[in-house]
Amino acid sequence: MADTVQTGQPRTPQLVRAASLVNAAQIAHDTEVRQSSNGVSFATFGETGLADLDLDRMLETVPTAITAALKANTYYFVPLALREAMAENSEAGADNAEALLKSELAAEPTMVASAYTDEFSDAAICHRNVELGHGRRGVFISTRLMGDRFALSFEFFINVAHAFVDQAGTPEVFADLAWKQALGGVRGETSIDAWETRNLAFGRPPNAQPEPTPVASRRNRGFASFSARQRAFASDDAATAVVGQVNAPSPLAPIDPQSSINDKERALYLEAAFSDAVAIYLLSLALDFDYSELREREYPLLSPAALAARLRVVAELYPPNPGYEFAVKYRRRA
């Protein structure tokens, strides 16, 4: 369970009687910060709708090898964090440096709604990062904007993964695997960032769809697809990614490794792919999910077999905490 980090006089819990807007920096100043058993600093404010057991389970999913890189971050779970609002002069032209500076200074502070309302929900965003000074950052996550535990967990894990990769970088063993897959023309990717930077690395337009290579026969070919039953978030059972066999689409044309490669975009691609893999790995530890739930319109999903290979590398680098388990199981769909 989480322990309180004592910073001065004990603070009494805040009772929220009606929805109101509060400066995020003020929340960070006034709200008690706690620490999960694996070292994640966090706090809650307002009517989050989160049960303590569910929150603890989500926080404690993060392996201690990853939380060591999160010391500068405190995760604030709030009902709604509002989108950035700028003063009227924020549209000053970029060629006017003085006006642009004034525009930036005129930015309103990050505001948080203490409870859910339709009006505040329309103005909310999934999360806001707030610099708190002295190298500290507050990540304010909108718990009431997420449709379910899956969405909230993934939002949290995405933020954790980005912060971790910013500090730790991309391991060579993962970079080698992901780049080999990209050179081999593996289908799809794990995020729009990974999809676009991978295309740009090979000199293609960011939204390019590579042509498939013809194959002589597709009979008896198989393709792994993640599928799992979703269960109660607070369950103590270890989460497992279940993989089924279905017919494979045609593979994409492999890339000539001697062709011109944009090294900057390649580095950005590998960073995005690793961050995505860490987030999906954490999600698989927290709860069961169907791989199709990660599907987006802007790009095709990475082939499940390729994703499984990436996740295994992440699991070897950052083993699960006690009470959590990572596994990939295969089954043939009838």
Where do the language-model regions lie?
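Pan-zinc metallopeptidase signature
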Residues: 1-37, 230, 239-334
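Post-HEXXH active-site segment of zinc metalloproteases
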Residues: 150, 154, 166-219, 290-301
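A metal-dependent hydrolase signature that marks the N-terminal structural subdomain at the beginning
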Residues: 1-150, 317-334
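Catalytic glutamate of the conserved HExxH
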Residues: 155-168, 277
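Short amphipathic alpha-helical segments and their helix-coil junctions
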Residues: 199-263
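Hydrophobic (often cysteine-bearing) scaffold residues that line and stabilize catalytic clefts
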Residues: 149, 153, 157, 267, ...
